[in-house]
Amino acid sequence: VEQGFSIWGIQLKSKKLPELELPEGATVHPVDKNLELPQPVSQYGTATVKGKLLDYHPGMTKKIRFILLDPIKSYTEFEANVGEDGSFSTTLPVCGTTPTICASFGSPIYFYAEPGKTSELFINQRELSRLQSKFHQNAKPYGPRVYINGPLQEIAQELSTYSFHTNLTETAMEKEDLASFK
């Protein structure tokens, strides 16, 4: 039903969900802390963002929202249409290595876009749903929230693996163990 309430992924045969099928190229890129960061690109051009929503069923979300954190134009929003198989693709105008957020799933997915390069996201909807569940958020993860390929993929994977708070009010600071971030 269009605009209706739907539930996907209910398993009646057992309490365990079937193994998540990962497409080719969906790998985790760990950070090598001994490597230096590459020089940021500083040129105007078009970046391609493509990917797939894992465990997608027709009737789920039809659009994905991207926010460019452009140092010149400030915040700029773009949308990509989602195909019947859960795939999406769009191009974004960028002025260099640009931090970008996929903001369609309740928790931001951080990655980078660069002119002339492709950023590829495999978004694990099963894990994103688990993290937002009051009953299952402390259960065993279903893998990473996202698998990222493209510019600064190791750093993007690290940013999307660990959630962090940017609200630095006194109340939020009391809950954080700041010594662990040093």
Give each language-model segment a name.
Residues 2-182:
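A non-transmembrane, solvent-exposed segment enriched in polar/low-complexity residues
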